[in-house]
From Swiss-Prot:
It comes from the Bacteria. It comes from Escherichia coli O6:H1 (strain CFT073 / ATCC 700928 / UPEC). This is Tat proofreading chaperone DmsD. GO terms for biological process: chaperone-mediated protein folding. Pfam families: Nitrate_red_del. Gene3D superfamilies: TorD-like. HAMAP family: DmsD_chaperone. The gene is dmsD. Belongs to the TorD/DmsD family. DmsD subfamily. Keywords: Chaperone.
Amino acid sequence: MTHFSQQDNFSVAARVLGALFYYAPESAEAAPLVAVLTRDGWETQWPLPEASLAPLVTAFQTQSEETHAQAWQRLFVGPWALPSPPWGSVWLDRESVLFGDSTLALRQWMREKGIQFEMKQNEPEDHFGSLLLMAAWLAENGRQTECEELLAWHLFPWSTRFLDVFIEKAEHPFYRALGELARLTLAQWQSQLLIPVAVKPLFR
């Protein structure tokens, strides 16, 4: 049985997407990735057909009056309400709260699997970016079954809706393109999963 997450390009793509959603664009983790995506050539290395990526190459390079840092602040930090909150429990919990039941279920799963993952201070573990970084770490450490459980049970049940809203409301060419790249890539991964994706009701 071969897991798609055993492929080298899985962990690279998961780490790139995770870092760009989780870290500020000027951070040491994300700045080199922003530089790569705003130049030609990255699409030849991405694990999707180049034809499907061609519009994104142009979009990533499109200029905007709003800087990348300003857009990231608006989309992921605030102070105003975030247009598409990146935490799973906001979508999966009836009250749309942080640290909801779905976050607790993720924590329980992590404990059962012996997974320790360092988060920013007092932030829920179910951030879209951190879940991708965790998936990359699991894949890199040969834990393919846990990687695919994480995706099927704790990310894919809400990520499509999150990305649809994120793309619709991003209002910045780089982050709209990033949302599109994530949506295409996660759809490809989901089509290759060996276990079914959990069906969970969404509340926004």
